[in-house]
């Protein structure tokens, strides 16, 4: 059984364990049926990523009247998500095999990161390589990683490609209680992966200012 979700936000999927797969089609428009059929019958490979987080239960979701950031969005979640921000599968088997920062890292310059992504499967597909950053020093930094770059890459079966990201030095900023933005930490961790920062098919690299 395949569950097809025509929704505008996250939803409760109580029967997910009884499903062989879940296809989230959002509101696909007039030609949505044809697009869904192409995916279901293998004419195309799915390659989208979640722009939101699916919580495991209502207890984990903040109240709509609560404006604090505690446990809100992927950047502040304290528990494991059901399906995290950035999650999404394809019909193939892709992974990031290498990731490295090019040149020196400083507070005044952008960060250049090169990643290698490979399609180890037998199906042509697109993959979205995602880059996240985390400040490991500042007490004002967000709890988890923050998305700082992504690129869609088309990969033939067995193909490997190199992808370069230019990450703004603003990605290293924190925001204090007065709304001021500045770089407070000296130790940052960059993560490049093909699923999301919570999954292991990725590479991490530590950088110091």
Residue ranges and their predicted role:
Residues 142-174:
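Intrinsically disordered, low-complexity Pro/Gly/Ser/Thr-rich segments with frequent PxxP/GP/PP motifs
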């Amino acid at each position: 059984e395949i569950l097809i979700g025509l929704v505008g936000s996250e939803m409760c999927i109580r029967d997910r364990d009884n499903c062989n797969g879940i296809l989230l089609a959002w509101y696909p428009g007039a030609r949505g049926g044809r697009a869904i059929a192409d995916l279901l019958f293998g004419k195309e490979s799915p390659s989208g990523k979640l722009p939101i987080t699916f919580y495991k239960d209502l207890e984990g979701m903040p109240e709509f009247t609560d404006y604090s950031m505690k446990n809100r969005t992927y950047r502040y979640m304290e528990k494991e998500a059901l399906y995290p921000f950035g999650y999404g599968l394809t019909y193939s088997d892709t992974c990031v095999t290498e990731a490295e920062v090019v040149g020196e890292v400083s507070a005044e310059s952008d960060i250049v990161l090169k990643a290698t992504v490979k399609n180890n499967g037998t199906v042509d597909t697109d993959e979205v390589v995602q880059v996240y950053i985390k400040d490991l020093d500042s007490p004002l930094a967000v709890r988890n990683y923050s998305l700082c770059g992504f690129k869609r890459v088309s990969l033939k079966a067995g193909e490997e490609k190199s992808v370069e990201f230019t990450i703004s030095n603003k990605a290293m900023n924190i925001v204090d209680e007065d709304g001021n933005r500045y770089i407070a930490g000296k130790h940052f961790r960059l993560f490049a992966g093909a699923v999301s920062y919570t999954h292991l098919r990725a590479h991490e690299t530590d950088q110091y200012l």
